[in-house]
Amino acid sequence: MTHIRAIYTDGACEGNPGPGGWGVVIYFTDGSVHELGGHHPATTNNRMELQAAIEALKAWRQLAPGSAIALYTDSEYVLRGITEWIHHWKRRGWKTAAKKPVLNQDLWQELDALNDPLVQWHHVRGHRGDVGNERCDLIARRLSRGQPIALRTLPPPLG
């Protein structure tokens, strides 16, 4: 049985705000790779980073539910948000320490609903040669510009 070895996520935005894209690369223990990506015509970089993480967790739940995964992001915003800040935001009724509404609350709530103790969140430094991060970055940047990119996908299940 094959398992997910690692998931990488990234988001990009041409201008901030502006057109954006997100990318997800899923590596399996058998060497196969599954990639996802999307575009939004008017967004921010942080929203695309969050969307990438959301789509990664949706894919994990579909492809390998119940298995532990390592999820890598170059976004400190996403990493600290989901592992540290979110607990405080929820306790304060989705307000920051300054009593202001949490930005991107809709996406944070969606990510929180998908998150699971089986997900191990990791930071990877962007643009440092990490193959998974570089591929996600390329997908996100291409899609933010509306440029085509061939995504590697798994064949549909038999039956």
Curated annotation (Swiss-Prot):
Keywords: Cytoplasm, Endonuclease, Hydrolase, Magnesium, Metal-binding, Nuclease. PROSITE patterns: RNASE_H_1. Mg(2+) 2 binds at D10, D137. Residues 1-145 form the RNase H type-1 domain. Pfam families: RNase_H. GO terms for cellular component: cytoplasm. NCBIfam families: PRK00203.1 (NF001236). This is Ribonuclease H. It comes from Thermosynechococcus vestitus (strain NIES-2133 / IAM M-273 / BP-1). The gene is rnhA.
